[in-house]
Design a protein with these regions (language model features):
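A short, amphipathic beta-strand motif
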Residues: 31-37, 47, 144
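Bacterial N-terminal signal peptides
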Residues: 10-19
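Acidic, glycine-anchored loop motifs typical of Ca2+
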Residues: 95-103
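Extracellular beta-sheet/turn segments enriched in Thr/Pro/Gly and aliphatic residues
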Residues: 112-147
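Sec/Tat signal peptide C-region and signal peptidase I cleavage site
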Residues: 19-26
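A glycine-anchored, Pro-Gly-centered beta-turn/N-cap motif
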Residues: 73, 78, 82-86, 138
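A short tyrosine-centered beta-strand micro-motif
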Residues: 87-91
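Bacterial N-terminal signal peptides that target proteins for export
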Residues: 1-11
Length: 147
């Protein structure tokens, strides 16, 4: 009888441990983003947050979209409820308010833009490997300079 009671006690303790871990994981992570380098106090900073290289490269959807009114030189927002993991951000300062990255006739961007980790691209967006950063459980911060 004591062995059965011990087994049920062990199972109950294991379930309680698993449940508390699941609750902690459900709490997720938050990401406090700061955008700096804005010269003009007009339009909005637009961005997208990706959780995979495929999505980042156009083979999937972003997990979050960001839009912050550009009313000062430094802007901040908090993205809550994220799963811990690896993420990357593409962003730009939408000066003309059309919600699109404006470009010249040759396809070169004419609005300021940036990637997470302040990564730079060569004739295109920064590579996932350069732009990706880790979001850990709890509070995280990341700063991007728009140029």
């Amino acid at each position: 009888m004591n062995q059965i009671k011990s087994i049920f006690t062990a199972i109950a303790m294991a379930v309680a441990t698993i449940s508390s871990v699941a609750i902690a994981q459900d709490a997720g992570a938050s990401l406090s983003l700061t955008f700096t380098g804005l010269d003009a106090k007009e339009g909005a900073v637009m961005g997208v947050l990706f959780d995979s290289e495929d999505a980042y490269n156009g083979k999937g959807a972003p997990v979050r979209q960001i839009m912050i009114t550009a009313d000062k030189a430094e802007l901040s927002t908090v993205l809550s409820g994220l799963k811990p993991g690896r993420y990357a951000i593409k962003s730009f300062h939408d000066l003309d308010g059309d919600h699109q990255m404006s470009s010249n006739p040759y396809g070169m961007p004419i609005e300021p833009f940036a990637f997470s980790n302040n990564a730079t691209g060569n004739m295109g967006p920064a590579k996932w490997a350069d732009a990706a950063f880790d979001v850990k459980p709890g509070a995280n911060t990341h700063s991007i300079t728009i140029k």
